[in-house]
């Protein structure tokens, strides 16, 4: 540009036009820069504000309300932590006491506290004194006393056992006795049945129960001692009364 300005004559028209264009465009660019200067200022301010905000965050700059809320939360967490530690300590103590108690019970169960058996020492025989019995009379008296005590204890045990009441097993039975027909005299049949006697057999109440077509059956109860009276024997004895009895059934059987 400077070199071309010194020339008094430009032979190239295009170069002249380009120089003129550059001449006029120079002030316009300066004007555009001055026009956009407020925008550049705003951008600079925004950058400065962002930079200040970042510096505050890095320095953990918080307001008073947020600081008090955090302090309360920290105090609450510390209290809960102390309470948990106390509860854990109590649980450990309780567990230790329970384990000790169980160990003591196991020792007692396994017979740790059993009394040691004391074995009586047998007196050693002296070969030199075999022919001489210096305490013969005393040993005989002791043997007699021990035998007497043993006999007394055996007698007392036998007497105690004899006085003990023995439980006798008994059964309550209800028998249904069916006659041949309606002409059978049930009263006579009952009388014949009651004539059956045995040690341990006791006859009870009886009644006539209708069956069908005017026929009745005899329902009679009895109590028997299980060791003395057999149910099979009793039913066989009743069935022997063939003139009256057709069949015998056990209606009920209960232990007493």
UniProtKB/Swiss-Prot annotation:
Write out the biased-composition intervals (Basic and acidic residues): 114-125
Q: Where on the chain is Phosphoserine found, per UniProt? A: 37, 53, 89, 137, 139
Record-stated family: Belongs to the EF-1-beta/EF-1-delta family.
Its job: EF-1-beta and EF-1-delta stimulate the exchange of GDP bound to EF-1-alpha to GTP.
Please report the organism this UniProt entry assigns to the protein. Answer: Drosophila melanogaster
A GO molecular-function annotation: translation elongation factor activity
Q: Which UniProt keywords apply?
A: Elongation factor, Phosphoprotein, Protein biosynthesis
Disordered: annotated span: 110-146
- Highest taxon in the source lineage: Eukaryota
One GO-annotated biological process of the protein: translational elongation
Signal peptide residues are none
KW Signal (keyword) present: no
Which Gene Ontology cellular component annotation is one that this UniProt entry carries? cytosol
Q: What residue spans carry the Acidic residues bias annotation?
A: 126-144
Could you tell me what this protein is called? Probable elongation factor 1-delta
Q: How does it assemble?
A: EF-1 is composed of 4 subunits: alpha, beta, delta, and gamma.
Q: Which InterPro entries match?
A: eEF-1beta-like_sf, EF-1_beta_acid_region_euk, EF1B_bsu/dsu, EF1B_bsu/dsu_GNE, Transl_elong_EF1B/ribsomal_bS6, Transl_elong_EF1B_B/D_CS
